[in-house]
Amino acid sequence: MNKLKQIDELLKKGHSLHEAGINNWAFLKKDALEVLNRFEELNVFILGGDVYVLSYDFFQPNYDDWYCNRFSNETDIEFLKRSIKIAKEFIMNYNIAYTEASQILLLSY
């Protein structure tokens, strides 16, 4: 299976936000971490992400986010590792009060 198909399969684990006009996917915390592990294997950079909360059947931003800019002297591998590390640290350390109702919008890649 090629890389794009593998990415598409991973994204299906999340909730598409396309109907809300957002070209991205929301994942539960544990699923987001699993996707990050697989993205690292596929060499997919993570540029950042946002936290969305499911409220009354609608995803709403809570305006918490993270980002990772590439350094000018960074190799692809260095940036990959650092971008995944920053994403994982944010997600693992993020305190979600309502775990089942909260989603982390992950992928700006």
Task: Indicate residue ranges for each PLM-predicted region.
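Long, contiguous N-terminal structural blocks used for assembly/anchoring
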Residues: M1-F27
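Short coil/turn linker and secondary-structure boundary residues
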Residues: N2, F27-K30, E74, R82
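Exposed alpha-helical structural elements
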Residues: Q6, D31-E34, I86
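Structured alpha/beta or helical-core interaction and ligand-binding surfaces enriched in interleaved
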Residues: I22, K29-V35, E41, L47, ...
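Ordered hydrophobic segments in well-structured contexts
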Residues: A26, F45-V53, Q103-S108
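Short secondary-structure junctions
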Residues: F39-F45, I96-T99
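Acidic, low-complexity, intrinsically disordered interaction modules
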Residues: V44-E89
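Amphipathic alpha-helical binding modules
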Residues: I77-Y109
